[in-house]
Amino acid sequence: MLDNIRAGAKGRGSCPAGTNNRDLSFDFAKGILITLVIIGHLLQYLIYQGTDAFWLSPYFKSIYMFHMPLFMAISGYLSSGAILRKSFTQGVGERAMQLLLPMLFWCTLIWTLKSAVIFPMKSLTDTLLDLSTEVIGTYWFIWAAFISFILIRVLTTFNRLSIWIISASAIAVAFAPITLSITPLLKYTYPFYCLGFLFAQPIGWQNGVIWRYKWIFVVLLSIAAFICFLGWGKETYAYNNLVLIHDEQSAKQVFLMFSGSLAASAVAMQSMFQCWRLVYSTRVARFVAVQLGQSTLLLYLVQGAVFRLMDLIQFGEVWNLTTRITFATVLGVAIVVIAMAIRSIARNLGYVSRIVVGAPPRPSLLKSQSVIN
């Protein structure tokens, strides 16, 4: 989701000139996933606002079963090059500049806007607590991706044993009895980051077994995902079970969560690849891949800010279901339009682009600045 690294996989779609052989099939998948993130939050914060009914919504469930795990798996896959080729200091430093710097900017913006409209003014302690909540909680996925990157980078120092150690770490982290802050969400997504990273390695078993019987696996995983979907409930979400096993029932929910997410993610990824093969030449597919898929960090930051500020709006009874759906549609489109406008403007403002968007300025702008200097 949050990586601008070229994918190593080939043959899933054509790449136009000037893209440096970037595999747009992954960008297409990321574009669809960030759209699902926005839709999922629209369901939670608008359609079902004020109730807990969204936990049982089949639409919410079908999205949350796989969208963040798959995002994390793609991030691990695309981060493989940076993890293996760059030094620890360089890799972590670049990832911090790419992820944490724009996140801090947007968290500060959210906190400033909320503080400006909330009266009376809070104490300094409450103010700092609110700021820390924005920094850690609002964009938890960024922290999960950043921490996962660091963990994998450290574990790769074990050379030949690193694959086995990374696999063991996925299990150890997933079942660690820790529930502090966003730790449950890290425990939930880290194994998928590891899986994505391992799939990027030239181990040989992917081509030998999985790809040879791909469609058999797809059918079996589709059946498994459907069964898990039927059993998925409120306590199956990592937000509620905290990925913590303390009795037989909690073990069942955690196992169902990981099994359902794994099966649904695999089926969804294969479906997106097949869809890309069929429609990659269309304008809609190119928009999803190039405009949305290559702007997922900015879209995630913008939608996070919008939905955090939605806490300031109270919907009355006049907001019936039809009105909410209409407003949600308009807001979803507005988020995309605003993000695209910010991207277009910020990329022309030099290093402001790194602070706001998390991406370098346009190459032409960098060249002109170097000539001036």
Swiss-Prot record:
Stated name of the protein: Nodulation protein NolL
Organism: Mesorhizobium japonicum (strain LMG 29417 / CECT 9101 / MAFF 303099)
Keyword NADP: no
Family per record: Belongs to the acyltransferase 3 family.
A GO cellular-component term linked to this record: plasma membrane
Highest taxon of the lineage: Bacteria
Gene that encodes the chain: nolL
Membrane-topology descriptor: Multi-pass membrane protein
GO biological process, one term: enterobacterial common antigen biosynthetic process
Predominant location: membrane
EC code(s) of this entry: 2.3.1.-
Keyword Cell cycle: no
Enzyme class: transferase
Keywords: Acyltransferase, Cell membrane, Membrane, Nodulation, Transferase, Transmembrane, Transmembrane helix
Matches recorded under Pfam families: Acyl_transf_3 (PF01757)
Subcellular locations according to the entry: Cell membrane
Role noted for this protein: Thought to be an acetyltransferase that modifies the fucose of the nod factor.
